[in-house]
Amino acid sequence: MTMTDPIADFLTRLRNANSAYHDEVSLPHSKLKANIAQILKNEGYISDFRTEDARVGKSLVIQLKYGPSRERSIAGLRRVSKPGLRVYAKSTNLPRVLGGLGVAIISTSSGLLTDRQAARQGVGGEVLAYVW
């Protein structure tokens, strides 16, 4: 069966594994999901990710990050732009998540960027998700 919104599925699997205190979560691989995982790693929300080749298809394995007393690094994830309602932001009107404490993931002509990187480069694009 085809998936209508693979990014929402990615975020939901990550949210569910995080709330169940799993150490890692496995999901179908795509370049877009790997780029989102790279942003999450750079921002300190996950500890690491890797790509595994299976017989059927590639999978992306994400290792979740927790504090010393198992407090979650990811407090929340929200899909913003959906297939039925796309959300775009200009470079002058980029969203701020929790006053700068969270991060907005934006798909730009320069690739996937955080809200801070997009503002620094002066580019806008489609707002994919908020992470805090």
Curated annotation (Swiss-Prot):
The keyword RNA-binding applies. Disulfide bonds: none annotated. SUPFAM superfamilies: Ribosomal protein S8. GO terms for molecular function: rRNA binding; structural constituent of ribosome. GO terms for cellular component: ribonucleoprotein complex; ribosome. Signal peptide: none annotated. Keywords: Ribonucleoprotein, Ribosomal protein, RNA-binding, rRNA-binding. One of its GO terms (biological process) is translation. InterPro entries: Ribosomal_uS8, Ribosomal_uS8_CS, Ribosomal_uS8_sf. It comes from the Bacteria. Belongs to the universal ribosomal protein uS8 family. One of the primary rRNA binding proteins, it binds directly to 16S rRNA central domain where it helps coordinate assembly of the platform of the 30S subunit. Part of the 30S ribosomal subunit. Contacts proteins S5 and S12. This is Small ribosomal subunit protein uS8. It comes from Mycobacterium tuberculosis (strain ATCC 25177 / H37Ra). The lineage of its organism: Bacteria, Bacillati, Actinomycetota, Actinomycetes, Mycobacteriales. The gene is rpsH.
